[in-house]
C-alpha cells in the first residue's frame, strides 16, 4: 500500500560519513556499541588506548573506501584494521596510518589519505550477523535486511546463499512495530534470550534512519559477544543529498579530503559530475541523454572523460563552471556539448559556452550539438562570437567528429606539434 503517494524521482548524491562519526550517531541514539574514540595523532591513539585499559585494542583507519582490511598503506603497513596489545603498539601502528595514503581495490592507484584512526576496545563475538535498513523500490519504502552471515561481504552471501538473507518491509506511514523487529531477529537466528535486545537495537537504528534522512544504515557485523550482549561493531550510513537543507549538522561533517577535487567543485556548482578515464569531455543536460552521449562516443571508438549532467535549469555560470571542470582534467583532448532544450534554453547554454571558451582560452576542439528551445538564437550567438566552435545538428555526426578530433590531437601531441584548429562554423 503506497497510500496514494506519488513518488517523485530526484537526482541524488549520497553523503557518506566516516565510521567514527556514524558510531557517534549510534551512541546518541542509544544503540549498543564498543567503547572507543577517534585519534588524530599517534600520541592521541596512545592516550585513548591507555584510558580504555583493556589488554588489547583495535585500531581502525578512517578512510571512505571499502576493503580497508585488505588494503596497504604507503608506509608499507598491510591492512587498515589492526589489533594491538599495548598503548605503545597503538602509537606505533597509528603512526604508520595517520597522514598516509591507503590503497584498496576501491581506491585504485590514487589511494585515500587517512587523517585519523578509531581506537576501540576489542570485543569477542560469539556469533556475527548482518543488519541493514535501506529504501527499496519494490516495497516503495524502507526495508530491514538481516542475515545470519555477518562480518563477510553481503554481496557474496546474496550470490551464493540468497536464502540466508531475510527482509522485513516497513510501512513508512505506520512506522516500525516491535513484532516486526522481533520476527526479523528470530529469522536471523538470534538466541531467544537476546532476541528482545537485538530487536530494541533495530528499532533504535530505524528511528535514526528516519531522523537523519538516511538512504542506508548498514551494520556489519551486529554481534552476540562472549558476555551475551548484542553490539553493533561497525556502522556505515549514507544520507540523501536532497535533505541537506534540513540536515545541516550532518552535511557539515562531510570530509572533502576524501573526495576527488573535481567532485568537490561539481558539488559547489550543483552539477552532477563523475570523472572517468577517457579523453573526450562531455557536457549534456539530463542523465539519460548524458549516458546515451557516452554510449555513442564509445560506439564510434572514443572514450568519455566524464559524465556531466548540467540539469534542466542550468545558468550561464553553471555552464562556465562545467567547462572549468572538464578542462581541469588534463587528459581531455576534445569536448562534445549535447543539449536538447526543453525547459533548458539553448541560447543560455550558448552564452555559457562562448563565455567559457573566451575566459578559459580553450585550445582544444569543441563540438556543439544543440536542438530545441531557442536553438536558432543559440546558433547565431555562436556564429557571432568569432570563436572556432564546431556546430553540428546530428548527434551521430557530432560524435564521429569529436572522436576524430581527439585522435588528431593525440597524434599532434605524440609528434610534439602545436596545431591550431581552424574549424568551420
Swiss-Prot record:
Catalysed reaction, written as an equation: succinate + ATP + CoA = succinyl-CoA + ADP + phosphate
Pfam family name, one: ATP-grasp_2
Ligase found in the keyword field: yes
Gene3D superfamilies cross-referenced by the UniProt entry: ATP-grasp fold, A domain (3.30.1490.20), ATP-grasp fold, B domain (3.30.470.20), Succinyl-CoA synthetase domains (3.40.50.261)
Modified residues (N6-acetyllysine): 40, 50, 91, 101, 105, 178, 330, 400
Locations listed in the record: Mitochondrion
Any GO molecular function: succinate-CoA ligase (ADP-forming) activity
Binding site for ATP: 60, 67-69
Pathway terms, separated by semicolons: Carbohydrate metabolism; tricarboxylic acid cycle; succinate from succinyl-CoA (ligase route): step 1/1
GO cellular component: mitochondrion; succinate-CoA ligase complex
Modification Phosphoserine, positions: 241
Keyword tags: Acetylation, ATP-binding, Ligase, Magnesium, Metal-binding, Mitochondrion, Nucleotide-binding, Phosphoprotein, Transit peptide, Tricarboxylic acid cycle
Keyword Magnesium in annotation: yes
Residue list for modification Phosphotyrosine: 46
EC primary class: ligase
PANTHER family in UniProt: SUCCINATE--COA LIGASE [ADP-FORMING] SUBUNIT BETA, MITOCHONDRIAL (PTHR11815:SF1), SUCCINYL-COA SYNTHETASE BETA CHAIN (PTHR11815)
Free-text function comment from the UniProt entry: ATP-specific succinyl-CoA synthetase functions in the citric acid cycle (TCA), coupling the hydrolysis of succinyl-CoA to the synthesis of ATP and thus represents the only step of substrate-level phosphorylation in the TCA. The beta subunit provides nucleotide specificity of the enzyme and binds the substrate succinate, while the binding sites for coenzyme A and phosphate are found in the alpha subunit.
Entry similarity comment: Belongs to the succinate/malate CoA ligase beta subunit family. ATP-specific subunit beta subfamily.
Protein name: Succinate--CoA ligase [ADP-forming] subunit beta, mitochondrial
Annotated source species: Sus scrofa
